[in-house]
UniProtKB/Swiss-Prot annotation:
Residues that bind acetyl-CoA: 97-102, 132-134
Gene name as annotated: GNA1
Protein's organism: Arabidopsis thaliana
Localization, UniProt: Endoplasmic reticulum membrane
Family: Belongs to the acetyltransferase family. GNA1 subfamily.
Null allele phenotype: Retarded vegetative growth, delayed flowering and short and thick inflorescence stems and siliques.
Record protein name field: Glucosamine 6-phosphate N-acetyltransferase
Family matches, as PANTHER family: GLUCOSAMINE 6-PHOSPHATE N-ACETYLTRANSFERASE
CDD domains per record: NAT_SF
High-level lineage: Eukaryota, Viridiplantae, Streptophyta, Embryophyta, Tracheophyta
PROSITE patterns: GNAT (PS51186)
Length: 149
């Protein structure tokens, strides 16, 4: 049976479809209770189109196969312009090689364009540079970070 995929915004029921476990393939998630998930989901939803999480669901199994998010930053630069920040793009290891990551990035970039953003940016590992170049992005700067434990 052929796999079919549907891209859409995150729904509250997606926790039961492996959403948190999928994020665990990207980085540390910790244990997120249903109550914590529901609270964070409602908080993010309250931001409307300024914070969007998309998922790709494999329709036969109902599992979340890929995800990514974007936050819209409102600036004073560029005539009070907006910039999109893509984060947390991950494709389940079982579904890699099917262009799902590219579909997630395109979905998020399309959202940024529809919101009137003048640019979209993201941070990625050196290993993922070629993937993002294939999505139409180019190396612009160096990322700096400081983690607070």
């Amino acid at each position: 049976m052929a796999e079919t995929f549907k891209i859409r915004k995150l729904e509250i029921s997606d926790k039961r479809k492996g959403f948190i476990e999928l994020l665990g393939q990207l980085t540390v998630t910790g244990s997120v209770t249903d109550e914590e998930f529901d609270r964070r989901f409602e908080e993010i939803r309250s931001y409307g189109d300024d914070h969007v999480i998309c998922v790709i669901e494999e329709e036969t199994s109902g599992k979340i196969a890929a995800t990514g998010s974007v936050m819209i930053e409102k600036k004073f630069l560029r005539n009070c312009g907006k910039a999109g920040h893509i984060e947390d793009v991950v494709v389940d290891s079982r579904f890699r090689g099917k262009q799902l990551g590219k579909k997630v990035v395109e979905f998020l970039m399309d959202h940024c364009k529809s919101m009137g953003c003048y640019k979209v940016i993201l941070d990625c590992s050196v290993e993922n540079k070629v993937f993002y170049e294939k999505c139409g992005m180019s190396n612009k700067s160096i990322q700096m970070s400081k983690y607070f434990d």
